[in-house]
Amino acid sequence: MEPEAPRRRHTHQRGYLLTRNPHLNKDLAFTLEERQQLNIHGLLPPSFNSQEIQVLRVVKNFEHLNSDFDRYLLLMDLQDRNEKLFYRVLTSDIEKFMPIVYTPTVGLACQQYSLVFRKPRGLFITIHDRGHIASVLNAWPEDVIKAIVVTDGERILGLGDLGCNGMGIPVGKLALYTACGGMNPQECLPVILDVGTENEELLKDPLYIGLRQRRVRGSEYDDFLDEFMEAVSSKYGMNCLIQFEDFANVNAFRLLNKYRNQYCTFNDDIQGTASVAVAGLLAALRITKNKLSDQTILFQGAGEAALGIAHLIVMALEKEGLPKEKAIKKIWLVDSKGLIVKGRASLTQEKEKFAHEHEEMKNLEAIVQEIKPTALIGVAAIGGAFSEQILKDMAAFNERPIIFALSNPTSKAECSAEQCYKITKGRAIFASGSPFDPVTLPNGQTLYPGQGNNSYVFPGVALGVVACGLRQITDNIFLTTAEVIAQQVSDKHLEEGRLYPPLNTIRDVSLKIAEKIVKDAYQEKTATVYPEPQNKEAFVRSQMYSTDYDQILPDCYSWPEEVQKIQTKVDQ
């Protein structure tokens, strides 16, 4: 089959400025005709490269660098210079590059963001812009925005309050919207809402790029968020997707519950994490050969991630036929004060739902011995929380214990894959939030740890939601997504210890998630894009961003020769 002809794209830009436009720049892939017509001939070396050669050049530079942070800077500079090449590089080996553009390296990048800030990659909206947020949105050069990732920087990964430095998270997240889900990067907008910071180091740092003040809270904060949501929806439409990211626990659930029925919004820390964790559990059940309702699940952590997973597990149990009250009893949570039980002081409304009749306990090892869970899920960002004794006990209670160490970055993981596999003698069904290398057991068997990365979830969800114009994102979408992800795990993957499809298939996974969301949306009459496409897969695929270069030339074409005949005589 012959390759498709490049898409023709017209621009009024010419000369040097065109080579500085990352949406149009092709570096040495410009043809001679393009260079001459666009007035950039002479600005580039007299060499003509294919995109494959350009990728090779980037990879060579990437591999010569000694630290992941330097590799991150290399890729961010490429994103600023040549957008299509940046995404071609990412998609050429997503397993290799994802840990650089997102977790775990993005955590270090956020800590250093004030030091390495180069140029705007998103909007910085501050509390002092109240009453004028609509005007600030007008500063962004793109008129069509279909997806926004927004944070206030208060709980960046497991690193805490990084204030304005948290901008690295929306930027990295939206890069994965495109690399993993095919969203058009020009239709994506990273946003930081700067309301101050409680981080003393940042407040004293002369290089800090954010507001030097304590965080604004209460009604002033809420009014600010209300104005932001209204301004975004007014400018970009009610079906502009707004993803909340890395908000503090105290705000995350509250804001999700406040906005979920008014706007097209979701919280990835709550719902995305829940979906990928439940996907891992569903895949694990194919190894344990039993049902979700046969499990007793213990969480180390009771923040937004833990509660989000717990709520989605309850939904999955209800779908399996278990009444909600019985489903809740299958789930136990441990927070910083110990086991969450009825009558314990200072329980939030969300935690109260999962409080059971039991004596108070504080020590995690003792709690594991008491509850005897079949599945242990860590989401508290306490590195090493799953001690050797806990792992031994899990293996003693269960033939195939399910152990998920989901905290990010790697330094916050509850245990490593090697510790888990070796202490349980390879019987554990393990997944982690950050990537771990394969582990070879004494018997020669090599196990590949499953990475429960939210990137399996949010790109496909965003692609599906945007494609059919959904105006609300329900929890059922995330349960459906979990089921789709689990279905993509083959028996061979399970034998290798993988609970998730290989990352290099993530675009295909996103396509299947989006296709299912689109099918359900039209069936449930919640889609707003009409007429309804007959072939849903082809429809979604047509929405996906191509990393192939466009042909940037004027639209030239021929007329019939007889029409073009030059008149040489005046008719008498």
UniProtKB/Swiss-Prot annotation:
InterPro entries in the record, alphabetically? Aminoacid_DH-like_N_sf, Malic_enzyme_CS, Malic_N_dom, Malic_N_dom_sf, Malic_NAD-bd, Malic_OxRdtase, NAD(P)-bd_dom_sf
pH influence on activity: Optimum pH is 7.8-8.1.
Q: Which residues carry this modification: N-acetylmethionine?
A: M1
Q: In which tissues is it expressed?
A: Expressed in all tissues tested including liver, placenta and white adipose tissue.
Q: What is its main location?
A: cytoplasm
In short, the EC number is 1.1.1.40
> Which coenzyme or cofactor does it need?
Mg(2+); Mn(2+)
Alphabetized, the UniProt keywords read: Acetylation, Cytoplasm, Metal-binding, NADP, Oxidoreductase, Phosphoprotein
- Subcellular location per the Swiss-Prot or TrEMBL entry: Cytoplasm
Record-level GO cellular component terms: cytoplasm; cytosol; mitochondrion
Co-factor remark: Divalent metal cations. Prefers magnesium or manganese.
Q: Where are the membrane-spanning stretches?
A: none
One GO term (biological process): protein homotetramerization
- Gene3D superfamilies per UniProt: Malic enzyme, N-terminal domain, NAD(P)-binding Rossmann-like Domain
Please list the residues that carry the modification Phosphoserine: S336
Classification via PANTHER family: MALIC ENZYME-RELATED (PTHR23406), NADP-DEPENDENT MALIC ENZYME (PTHR23406:SF17)
Oligomeric and partner information: Homotetramer.
Protein name (record) = NADP-dependent malic enzyme
**The encoding gene:** ME1
